[in-house]
UniProtKB/Swiss-Prot annotation:
This is Probable molybdenum ABC transporter permease protein HVO_B0370. Belongs to the binding-protein-dependent transport system permease family. InterPro entries: MetI-like, MetI-like_sf. Residues 65-258 form the ABC transmembrane type-1 domain. The lineage of its organism: Archaea, Methanobacteriati, Methanobacteriota, Stenosarchaea group, Halobacteria. PANTHER family: MOLYBDENUM TRANSPORT SYSTEM PERMEASE PROTEIN MODB.
Amino acid sequence: MSHRQPNRRERGVTRLLPETWRGLTLLLAGVLLLYYLLPIGALVFAQSPASLATDVTNEVVLTAATNSVVAATLSTLVAVAFGVPLAYWLSRTSFRGRDVILALVMLPLVLPPVVSGMLLLRLVGPAGLGQLTSVPLTRSLFGVVLAQTYVASPFLVVTAKTAFDGVDRQLEAAARSLGEDRVGSVRRVTLPLAKQGILAGVTLTFARAIGEFGATLMLAYYPRTLPVQIWVSYLSTGLDAAFPVALVLVGIAVGAILLVHALGTNPWE
């Protein structure tokens, strides 16, 4: 039985479809990229370069930037220290109630940040654990770290768990059969293979932490971080006064992502 050969028109349509799809893909991708870029461009050109340079080097802005970077770094380190073991445990164990724990981990991702701040304030505020310790748990850098860790650490746990899920358990078993103990097999086999996913989680956690506003506002209005300072500047002076602070925040966030890429550990490759 012979098959009919496509005619010239049909062959032309066949060649045209991939080209059309490629063009449509580039168009849609370009529109979204432009949508990401235009607000940043509007932010950069909102003021003259001289005025912008003066505003971003203001002591208040620099102090808020320092608070943000320090707190976000500490929050990310805390998330790594506790989140990576939690992610590994959730990935490698199966038990009744596991889904409940996963839901608990993801809860801060779906709660409005202000609600997260309210919950934390009830827990560690003057009516909670705050009355049991002399360490200031609110209105302090420690409070900022608590707020940022609560809302940002789930990004690390979720991405690290996904990375661990992608590592074959048989590789750990093979390492143990060659003399490695459980810790050694995880350190020498699983962690290197899951590294890219964990780094993606670190980047997302830092970016989320440094941009955290709602929970931080509820728990630690002082010392001011960049998001809180943006809000204060907007309320006190107006949108123009908030632009330079926002630009510093954008610059730090972009710089953190570029730093990961520059170190040769781009988690998205």
